[in-house]
Regions:
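Flavin-binding catalytic cores
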Residues: 50-55, 60-104
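Alpha-helical elements of Rossmann-like donor-binding domains used by nucleotide-donor carbohydrate transfer enzymes
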Residues: 36, 40, 79, 83, ...
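FAD-binding beta-loop-beta segment adjacent to the flavin cofactor pocket
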Residues: 45-53, 97-126, 130-132
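Central helical "cap/lid" subdomain
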Residues: 1-28, 90-93
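Anionic-ligand binding region
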Residues: 25-58, 66-68
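A conserved FAD-binding loop/helix module that cradles the flavin
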Residues: 118, 123, 128-154
Length: 154
């Protein structure tokens, strides 16, 4: 089924993880702005049972990620960190640690448009969010469809 996979496309996502000195009042817990270079920002330390460090995760937009995908992690962090500080209204002096990660195939941009593929003998299945769309529900629906097919419920 390799031929079926040729049309599936993915966008990369460059991600910054930063530990900051605790902020008195963070300006937000999460922020989404698809038109910004930092399309998604979250206060990871807002989750229950976390330490006192202010830990933030920022994900770049697909366009920004494509532009800088081949940069090394240090360069990516050096570019993204000032943007995060700007969005949080802080200076770099608040930063204790920062690192970047490249997800080359982070988000499906052109899904398969069916819940799964399998070989003709139905002994090998492939599924996931890449089959139906870039959301958790797509991954769940894909897995559920595979299970139903195996059980003969489809």
């Amino acid at each position: 089924f390799a031929g079926e996979l040729e049309g599936v496309g993915f966008d990369p996502c460059l991600t910054l993880m930063a530990a900051l000195k605790p902020l008195c009042t963070p300006p937000f817990v999460t922020r989404t702005d698809v038109d910004d270079a930092l399309a998604w920002i979250a206060d990871d330390s807002s989750k229950p049972d976390r330490g006192t460090e202010a830990c933030w995760v920022a994900q770049a937009s697909p366009a920004w990620s494509v532009k800088y995908l081949n940069s090394d992690s240090e360069a990516i962090a050096a570019m993204m960190l000032p943007m995060l500080c700007d969005r949080l209204g802080i200076t770099n002096a608040k930063v204790r640690y920062a690192t970047a990660h490249r997800w080359r195939y982070a988000k499906v941009s052109q899904p398969l448009e069916k819940p799964f593929i399998c070989n003709t003998s139905r002994t090998l299945y492939a599924g996931g969010d890449w089959c139906l769309g870039a959301r958790l529900e797509a991954a769940w629906t894909s897995g559920d469809s595979i299970a139903r097919d195996i059980l003969g419920l489809a």
